[in-house]
Swiss-Prot record:
<feature type="propeptide">
    <location>
        <begin position="20"/>
        <end position="31"/>
    </location>
</feature>
<keyword id="KW-0964">Secreted</keyword>
<comment type="function">
    <text>Blocks Kv3 voltage-gated potassium channels. Reduces blood pressure.</text>
</comment>
<dbReference type="GO" id="GO:0090729">
    <property type="term" value="F:toxin activity"/>
</dbReference>
<dbReference type="GO" id="GO:0015459">
    <property type="term" value="F:potassium channel regulator activity"/>
</dbReference>
<keyword id="KW-0165">Cleavage on pair of basic residues</keyword>
<feature type="signal peptide">
    <location>
        <begin position="1"/>
        <end position="19"/>
    </location>
</feature>
<comment type="similarity">
    <text>Belongs to the sea anemone type 3 (BDS) potassium channel toxin family.</text>
</comment>
<keyword id="KW-1015">Disulfide bond</keyword>
<feature type="disulfide bond">
    <location>
        <begin position="39"/>
        <end position="65"/>
    </location>
</feature>
<keyword id="KW-0166">Nematocyst</keyword>
<feature type="disulfide bond">
    <location>
        <begin position="37"/>
        <end position="72"/>
    </location>
</feature>
<keyword id="KW-0632">Potassium channel impairing toxin</keyword>
<dbReference type="InterPro" id="IPR023355">
    <property type="entry name" value="Myo_ane_neurotoxin_sf"/>
</dbReference>
<keyword id="KW-0872">Ion channel impairing toxin</keyword>
<protein>
    <recommendedName>
        <fullName>Kappa-actitoxin-Avd4c</fullName>
    </recommendedName>
</protein>
<dbReference type="GO" id="GO:0042151">
    <property type="term" value="C:nematocyst"/>
</dbReference>
Length: 76
C-alpha cells in the first residue's frame, strides 16, 4: 500500500511540474491578441485593440489613431 501511495505522489508531482512549465510557455506567446487595422495617412498596417482607450505597453507602439471604441496602434 505504501508503494502505491508513493507512486501516486510521484506522478502527481510530475504532473504539477509539467503543467507549470506549460504555463510559462503560454506567458510568452508568439502572437498578439489584436486584429489588423489601417489609419488614414499611414501606409502600414496597425494592430486594432478592441475596447481599449490606450495602446498596451511592451509592444513598442509609438503612434495610434482612434476608431471608437477601439484603438489602432502602430509600432513605427
Amino acid at each position: 500500500m505504501n508503494k502505491a501511495l508513493f507512486l501516486c505522489l510521484v506522478v502527481l508531482c510530475a504532473a504539477v511540474v509539467f503543467a507549470a512549465e506549460d504555463l510559462q510557455k503560454a506567458k510568452h506567446a508568439p502572437f498578439k491578441r489584436a486584429a489588423p487595422c489601417f489609419c488614414p495617412g499611414k501606409p502600414d498596417r496597425g494592430d486594432l485593440w478592441i475596447f481599449r482607450g490606450t495602446c498596451p505597453g511592451g509592444y513598442g507602439y509609438t503612434s495610434n489613431c482612434y476608431k471608437w471604441p477601439n484603438i489602432c496602434c502602430y509600432p513605427h
